Design a protein with these regions (language model features):
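Membrane-integrated ABC transporters
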Residues: 1-29, 36, 44-58, 65, ...
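Short intracellular "coupling" helices and adjacent cytoplasmic loop segments at the cytosolic face
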Residues: 46, 82, 90-114, 118-120, ...
Length: 579
């Protein structure tokens, strides 16, 4: 397995120590049957107590070395396996951080969680076993077979005939178990997906009375996982008894043949005892080998799933000669067309406009017109399919991604909160911010009032995904987070939708001095939110069908007129024109 070998090479010293401890333990264990054989032949049968006492001392010394070897072996194995699992999880997480939205959609959140946790854990279990047995098993088996051949060639035929039967059985079991293991891991993905959907969408499920449907969906997937696991466990549970049955038959045959050999003085009683001990070591080595071989399919499936993530190259990457972006003075869309990965039709078509520092730009249009998609392209969450987006006259693909995003403050349509304090959420983009800066940002975002009513104020805890605060409070905290960052380009993607009209108006007024030296980009549904914009872009089916000020669009754009008249009275529109 390339994945395991790649990470194993990082711990060469520990692996070498593991190697040494394996050899030490194996040689000690394999020496004991020979000593017992000599004790029987030269001590017990001759009643030489002095010889027996001397061999007892040697056995005690060897046993201490053997125990020390086992302890050292266990420590090395746990050290290597846990560290490698940690490294795999870190690498998967770090690699996923560079994924664009397209790669994240390809794998899915639930599958990524399963790969990072469950699949990495399966590899740890496999590593822990293989590091103990991969070196120990061949040494024990090879040396035991050599000693068996040395003791009696006739008896060794029993062992040599048994081993191929066991190995053949293991190969068959491994082939049968691999597809079952793969189905298991995929089923865990689906179970996690259903769980996640039910936890995050519990209100929708209840409002549509779909609890029974969701229970059945989860139960069906859970039953499938149970069935696959049961088949796997049954397969494994049959393998071990079969092995011991075969081992017992071999032992009985050895004892039967030994009677004839003892009568002809071909072997001694000590030889027979040692032979049976070595036979046990051979069989146990084969058993351990079987266990590793049976664990391999599941670990291999997990390794493939992890490699699938690590081998996926992010589609959004830095240019080889990327440049730093210090501030944004101008922003231009030049004949931009965009289609989502695997999408049949373009979501945006021939988008063309320019704006500069100090301007407020608004985007409005019907649902599905491409408003949110347009602003996502500015952050390079996706790259354009055709055309270019330029900042300060340079294609944004030429800029270093980190420096580009450091100049953009983006408030998503759905506000996201992290588990932690209100302070940590506001300061997420600027952890070093002073208390005064944080309070100012919260005040501008109209969040300070509700924060002051909380028991611990800014230190009050927010639950995972902000489940203990309202939608409007989430939006205000998200807005405060961006205000504190002080970017060159503010992007508010329908971020005022959960606010009442009064709070919306106060917030927009408070925002003006904050954004006067930046480009202020707003996606909105409300005409009242964007009436004072320097330029309003009207989108319909991914195309610009109108562009200008509020007054200009009321005269020239029929779609804008429809939206305006559906939200405002003629008197309100006339009053705005007069002012």
């Amino acid at each position: 397995m390339k994945l395991i070998w790649k990470y194993l090479m990082k711990y060469k010293k520990w692996f070498l120590l593991d190697f040494i401890s394996v050899f030490g333990f194996a040689l000690v264990e394999l020496g004991i049957p020979t000593i017992i054989s000599d004790m029987i032949d030269y001590g017990i049968e001759t009643q030489d107590t002095t010889y027996l006492y001397s061999r007892f001392g040697i056995m005690a010394f060897i046993s201490v070395i053997g125990v020390s070897g086992v302890v050292l072996l266990g420590y090395c194995c746990s050290k290597i396996s846990t560290n490698i699992t940690r490294d795999i999880r870190n690498d998967v997480f770090e690699h996923a951080q560079a994924f664009s939205a397209a790669e994240m959609e390809k794998f899915g959140v639930s599958s990524m969680i399963t790969r990072t946790n469950n699949d990495a854990y399966q590899i740890m279990l496999f590593l822990n076993v293989i590091l103990k047995s991969a070196l120990l098993t061949p040494v024990m088996m090879c040396v035991s077979v050599m000693l068996i051949l040395k003791i009696s060639l006739e008896l060794s035929y029993v062992v040599l005939a048994t081993i191929p039967v066991v190995i053949l059985g293991v190969i068959i079991v491994a082939k049968v178990s691999e597809p079952l293991s793969e189905n298991q891991q995929k089923s865990i993905d689906h179970i996690n997906q259903i769980l996640r959907e039910n936890i995050t969408g519990i209100r929708v499920i209840r409002s549509f009375n779909k609890q029974e449907y969701e229970k059945k969906r989860f139960s069906n997937e859970n039953d499938f996982y149970r069935d696959q696991s049961a088949k796997l466990f049954k397969l494994m549970s049959c393998t071990e008894p079969s092995f011991f049955f075969l081992m017992n038959i071999a032992t009985v045959i050895v004892y039967y043949l030994s009677c004839t050999l003892l009568n002809s003085n071909a072997v001694t009683l000590g030889n027979v005892v040692a032979f049976v001990e070595y036979l046990f070591h051979v069989m146990m080595s084969v058993l351990i080998f079987c266990m590793v071989f049976m664990m391999y399919p599941r670990a291999n499936v997990s390794a493939k799933r992890i490699m699938e993530v690590l081998d996926t190259k992010p589609s959004i990457v830095n240019d080889e000669n990327s440049i730093q972006l210090d501030s944004i003075q101008t922003l231009s869309f030049k004949d931009v067309t965009f289609s989502y990965p695997n999408g049949e039709e373009a979501v945006l078509k021939n988008i063309d406009f320019s704006c500069h520092k100090g301007q407020k730009i608004a985007v409005i249009g019907s649902t599905g017109s491409g408003k949110s998609t347009l602003v996502k392209l500015m952050n390079r969450f996706y790259d354009v399919s055709r055309g270019s987006i330029e900042i300060n006259g340079v294609d944004i693909r030429k800029y270093d991604l980190e420096s580009l995003r450091s100049q953009i403050g983006y408030v998503a349509q759905k506000a996201h909160m992290f588990k932690g304090s209100i302070q940590s959420n506001i300061c997420f983009g600027k952890p070093e911010a002073s208390v005064e800066e944080m309070v100012h940002a919260a005040t501008v975002a109209q969040a300070s009032d509700f924060i002051s009513t909380r028991e611990h104020g800014y230190e009050d805890e927010i639950a995972e995904d902000g489940t203990n605060i309202s939608g409007g409070q989430k939006q205000r905290l998200s807005i405060a987070r961006v205000i504190l960052k002080k970017p060159s380009l503010y992007i508010y993607d329908d971020s005022f939708s959960a606010l009442d009209f009064k709070t919306d108006a106060i917030l927009r007024k408070a925002l003006k001095p904050e954004v006067k030296n930046a480009i202020f980009f707003v996606v909105a549904q409300r005409i009242s939110t964007i009436m004072d914009s320097d330029m309003i872009i009207v989108l319909d089916e991914g195309q610009i069908i109108g562009m200008g000020t509020h007054v200009q669009l009321l005269k020239d754009c029929s779609v804008y007129q429809e939206i305006a008249h559906s939200q405002l009275t003629q008197k309100e529109l006339d009053d705005y024109e007069r002012n």
